[in-house]
Every structure is written in structure tokens, then in C-alpha cells.
Amino acid sequence: MLRRLVVTTMACLAAGCGSSDPAPSPPSPSVAGSTVTITSSGVSPKNLLVSPGTQVTFVNSDSRNHEMASDPHPEHTDCSAINTVDLVVPGQSKQTSNLNIVRTCGYHDHQNPEIASLRGTITIQ
């Protein structure tokens, strides 16, 4: 009988042992920057999906200058955060301001607004 009591007590203690701290929760997703690459073929990716608060980096891998601006041309009033990129010379990278408002922003190369391959969208979601 005593042995049964000891075994039962030990089992209860073992079940109750362990950390009283709750299991760690996975880290919240961080807002990581995203990249648009500009080449002689155009921008890639054409359509980019980012989280609110993200800054997008435009990398000019082309041999000529590009002036990235928000739609519509020539007013550039759609997403002012994109207009901070402005002129990007070959080999240079520039970031937008934080894209905070949930929406879709169109952009283009101001120097070549008619070239479809140099147009894209950033969706903040």
C-alpha cells in the first residue's frame, strides 16, 4: 500500500514538474525590405507584394540612368514614398520611404514613361 502511495505521488509530481513559463511563441513577422532590380530588360519583379511599413530598394543594374517615380505620369501623386527614389545611376541602389498605407502603387521610369517594361506595381497588404 505504501509503495502504491509513493508511486502515485511520484507520478503526480512528475506530471506537474516542468517549466512554469509558457512555451515561447514564434517571433512576429518582421517587415523586411524588398528589392526591385532595373535592367535593360525592365524592372523585376513587375508586381511586388510587401507588408505595411516596408521600404523597397531599387537597384540599377542597367548601364543607363533611371528616374523612378510614382504614377500617374507626370504628376507622380499616387505614392509619394516611391518618389524618394528619384534618379538611380548605374550600379546605385536607392530606397523608398516607408510604404505605410494599404493599397497598390504604380510606378514608372519618369524618363521613359511609355516603356511598359519599366513600369510596375507595389501592393502594400
Language-model-derived ranges and their functions:
Residues 1-6:
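Bacterial N-terminal signal peptides that target proteins for export
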Residues 13-16:
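C-terminal motif of bacterial Sec signal peptides marking the signal peptidase cleavage site
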Residues 18-32:
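Ser/Thr/Gly/Pro-rich low-complexity, disordered linker/stalk segments of secreted
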Residues 19-23, 86-125:
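Extracellular/periplasmic metallocenter environments
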Residues 29-55:
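N-terminal edge beta-strand
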Residues 46-69, 93-101, 105:
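Beta-strand cores of secreted/periplasmic/IMS beta-sandwich domains, seen most often
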Residues 61-64, 72-75, 113-114:
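Acidic glycine-/aspartate-rich tracts in secreted/extracellular proteins
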Residues 70-85:
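Surface-exposed, flexible coil segments in extracellular/virion-facing regions
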